[in-house]
């Protein structure tokens, strides 16, 4: 995503656009079904892709804060904000590609937003369950999840610094769903589960919130977050060894 000064071009003419996104050919991820309808409206405004990402970040953090209340109403409201956050997380890439404003910096900002919202959500959820139940174990599970997510994010950032990239475009959202060539079955299963659940995680949260069952995410995430960063490092080490 280039500097926002490029956004002074006429928005009404849209002559500089590559075009709005087309209707998704696949049902999943479900968030794409929402984003492709919202993106054309965003393209009629001066809002740039980085601003869409920033709005997604703010909505996600607010939704995470709402979860700290620990009540049924807070869970549903917080879930709706998380849903908006995830929808805009798809929109920013669509806006960037439509306007030809994709960049490495925009991709890194998007990755940061994903990490920040996910980490804040589990911290908010854990605090909320602890607040209502009085059992501190839920807070420790949230901290374990946040730790695992942060380690994995740091591993990715370290890899970005080491690896040189030839193009400056943001990775398309469809590419995020591509399955890596990993011979290890366990690593592959963890990767697929993490990637697909991440794409529509907001719907999982909303569904569980309607039944006051979001607490089940905490023990699952506390274990899964550690497994994913271990697999991520394992995958990168194997790839580095194969390139030598």
Indicate residue ranges for each PLM-predicted region.
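A feature for the membrane-embedded catalytic helix bundles of lipid/isoprenoid biosynthetic enzymes
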Residues: 2-39, 111-244
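Helix-capping/transition residues at the boundaries of transmembrane alpha-helices
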Residues: 42-44, 96-97, 208-209
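Short helix/strand-bridging catalytic loops that position acidic/His residues to coordinate divalent metals
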Residues: 99-112, 129
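Membrane-embedded alpha-helical segments that form the functional core of polytopic membrane enzymes
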Residues: 46-105, 122, 141
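Short, contiguous, helix-prone interaction/anchoring segments in small proteins
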Residues: 33-34, 39-53
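Active-site His/Glu-centered metal-binding helix of metallohydrolases
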Residues: 87, 91, 95, 108, ...
């Amino acid at each position: 995503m280039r500097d926002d000064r490029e956004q002074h071009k006429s928005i009404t003419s849209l002559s500089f656009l590559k075009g709005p996104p087309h209707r998704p050919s696949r049902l999943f991820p479900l968030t794409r079904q929402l984003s492709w309808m919202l993106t054309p409206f965003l393209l009629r405004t001066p809002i740039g892709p980085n601003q869409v990402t920033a709005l997604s970040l703010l909505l996600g953090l607010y939704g995470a804060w709402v979860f700290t209340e620990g009540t049924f109403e807070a869970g549903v409201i917080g879930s709706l904000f998380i849903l908006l956050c995830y929808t805009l997380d798809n929109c920013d890439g669509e806006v960037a590609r439509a306007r030809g404003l994709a960049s490495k910096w925009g991709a890194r900002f998007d990755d940061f937003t994903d990490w920040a919202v996910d980490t804040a959500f589990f911290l908010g959820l854990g605090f909320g369950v602890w607040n209502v139940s009085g059992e501190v174990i839920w807070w420790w599970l949230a901290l374990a999840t946040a730790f695992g997510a942060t380690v994995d994010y740091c591993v990715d950032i370290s890899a970005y610094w080491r690896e040189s990239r030839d193009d400056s475009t943001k990775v398309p959202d469809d590419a995020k769903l591509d399955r890596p060539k990993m011979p290890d079955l366990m690593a592959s299963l963890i990767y697929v589960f993490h990637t697909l659940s991440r794409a529509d995680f907001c719907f999982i949260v909303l569904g569980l919130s309607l039944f006051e069952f979001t607490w089940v995410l905490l023990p699952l995430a506390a274990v899964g977050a550690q497994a994913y960063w271990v697999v991520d490092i394992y995958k990168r080490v194997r790839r580095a060894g194969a390139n030598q």
